[in-house]
Regions:
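A helix-centric hydrophobic-segment signal that preferentially recognizes long
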Residues: 2-162
Length: 162
């Protein structure tokens, strides 16, 4: 009888370990995807700053100082994304003026900016999809136990502008 009880306890412990490792691998998989997306977001944001600097050289020299100060700030990618959108929208509104319509260099930069925005939105969607999966695992049984023991936090979601 003692052997049966020990066998059942050992089986339950082994089952718990297998379940724990299974969900840990799922978490690790999604965290790997999120970190890859974060790296891509940072690269694309750097390219966006470079393009905005070139546009600012043509349109508004005062914005160059603002962008240089922005470049020196220590911001999270979420804050960076929000502030760059507002700066980019201001510059693009100024670029829509009639005096700049015939400027081919500016038009090429705006096209590059639009391509960069499409890439950024795609990477942000990829990040959001994987962050939502991690956040869902954080609230479901038994993966919430794994998340609790490994101290996983919920991830922030980007608000993507249309």
């Amino acid at each position: 009888m003692l052997y049966v009880i020990c066998g059942i306890v050992l089986f339950l412990i082994l089952l718990f370990i297998i379940i724990f490792l299974h969900f840990k691998k799922k978490y690790d998989f999604y965290f790997l995807k999120v970190s890859e997306a974060n790296n891509n977001i940072e690269i694309i944001i750097e390219k966006k700053i470079e393009i905005l600097l070139k546009i600012a050289q043509i349109i508004d020299k005062d914005k160059i100082k603002e962008l240089e100060e922005f470049k020196g700030k220590e911001l999270t990618s979420h804050q960076c994304y929000i502030e760059l959108n507002s700066i980019g929208n201001k510059l693009l509104k100024e670029a829509d003026d009639e005096e700049y319509e015939s400027n081919k260099k500016l038009n090429n930069l705006i096209d590059r900016f639009d391509d960069n925005e499409c890439d950024l939105k795609g990477v942000l969607k990829y990040y959001n999809d994987n962050a939502v999966e991690i956040n869902n695992y954080k609230h479901k049984f038994p993966s919430n136990i794994v998340g609790f023991f490994l101290h996983y936090k919920e991830l922030d979601i980007y608000k993507i502008e249309k």
